[in-house]
Amino acid sequence: MVCRALVVTLAIGAAALPAATQAYDIKAKTPETAFSGKQRPDILGISADSTADSARATLDSFFKGRSNATSDIQQQKFGNTAVNFISALNFSLPAGPGQNGEVLSSSFSSPASGNRLYFFARNLTFAKEQQPAKADMVREVMGKYGAPTIVGDQHLYYIYRAGSIVSVGTKYKEATAIEAIGKPLDPKAALKLNGETIRGSCVAVVKRAQTKEKVLAAMLSEAKGANCDGVLSVQLIPGTAPDRVGIAQFSLLDVKRVISAAAIDNDAMAAEQSERNASPKGSAPKL
């Protein structure tokens, strides 16, 4: 009798559960991206094509067997539904004698926009005895990503518009990039990069993105004001000697995706809320 009462109670309880706890069907839309065709830069194989699940698999494999590595898998709910999704992945490995330190962080849109990557950063701290030559690092970067848009202030910047890397006139070869990286950014090149637009500099946008909260709402205003579709920034911070690299910081920001995914996610959230708060559709009975 007690068992029967329990079953009845559970059945009634399940029927009375609010909509937030029941399955919700999300019809995903693919957000736009700054990167297309062959122009799809990646960091450790993670690119704008990556979803939270595929990025997590890549990072799990990368850190496999490293006992002192830590991970922080951040999840959140989609609106007031019971749907959980990964919004951010953070992995770290402390630097030590003979061991390089790693900090990797990535941010993803909601399932409504495919749970896609829009920001990824890798900070690599080299052990003192393993600090590479700055010239070698510049060659490695250019060998992987091609000629940058602008070089200076210890950075190589790749600015993307309309699916391609922007050129401001200077055609960087390895030798000219190695020479320019330790100098201030060329103001003439910066002016050419901005052109006649009054929109914000993508160099400034990616720098601020590195320090602010990595959620779409916090990044949207800057993204809408940026004069590019995407940025790849590589910073090579000097190490124990000026010609050595102590820290290498890689940042990939898909500006176009921030704008597109935010619009898709906001529309989906509004639709979910409207559905949840829909007025009853019953009609008065005949009397």
Can you name each region flagged by the protein language model?
Residues 1-3:
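N-terminal secretory signal peptides that target proteins for export/translocation
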Residues 5-16:
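Bacterial N-terminal signal peptides
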Residues 6, 28-31, 40, 93, ...:
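Sparse, context-dependent recognition of short Cys/His-centered cofactor- or disulfide-binding micro-motifs
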Residues 22-74, 121-287:
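Non-cytosolic coordination micro-motifs
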Residues 68-126:
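Mid-chain, structured segments of secreted extracytoplasmic proteins
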